[in-house]
């Protein structure tokens, strides 16, 4: 989050300094990188926010890739959510946004899936980004290129 904010401020011509105890502890290095409001089964305002984010992310990533000169690993690959039964699948909060899968279709999408899983939902609109290996590195490079200063090894207490 911090590097994303730093990047946007620097793009607007602001002087930015990122203070960090250890950059390797940043949320981006531990988060899974799922861009999946539908697969997560969100609802209400949180789902709407996630859906809006899915529309904005490609443009945001393109800015980072342009400024950093490297790819961020954004993939609009879809995400499959398996279920033990078709009833469970059909009751999932975001089922209406997914493509229903039966057992053979589920096996095709997830080879070797255990026999407990009998149904699934494919959320084609969901995707992922490679946080750890690509996005964070691209953000660091983009920030550096825009003049962001880094103060590593400093703990902020207040």
For each predicted feature, which ranges?
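N-terminal Rossmann-fold NAD(P) dinucleotide-binding loop
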Residues: 2-3
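Dinucleotide-binding Rossmann-like beta1-alpha1 core, especially the glycine-rich loop
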Residues: 34-109
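Helical element adjacent to the flavin cofactor pocket in flavoenzyme catalytic cores
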Residues: 121-158
């Amino acid at each position: 989050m911090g590097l994303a904010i730093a990047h946007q401020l620097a793009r607007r011509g602001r002087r930015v300094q990122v203070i960090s105890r250890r950059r390797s502890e940043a949320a981006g290095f531990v988060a899974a990188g799922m861009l999946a409001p539908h697969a997560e089964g969100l609802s209400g305002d949180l789902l709407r926010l996630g859906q809006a984010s899915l529309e904005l992310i490609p443009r945001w990533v393109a800015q980072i890739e342009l400024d950093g000169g490297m790819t961020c690993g954004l993939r609009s690959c879809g995400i499959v959510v398996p279920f033990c039964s078709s009833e469970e699948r059909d009751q999932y909060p975001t089922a209406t946004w997914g493509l229903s899968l039966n057992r053979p279709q589920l096996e095709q999408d997830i080879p070797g899936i255990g026999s407990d899983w009998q149904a699934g939902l494919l959320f084609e609109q969901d995707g992922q980004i490679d946080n750890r290996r690509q996005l964070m590195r691209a953000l660091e490079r983009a920030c550096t290129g825009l003049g962001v200063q880094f103060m590593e090894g400093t703990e902020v207490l207040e």
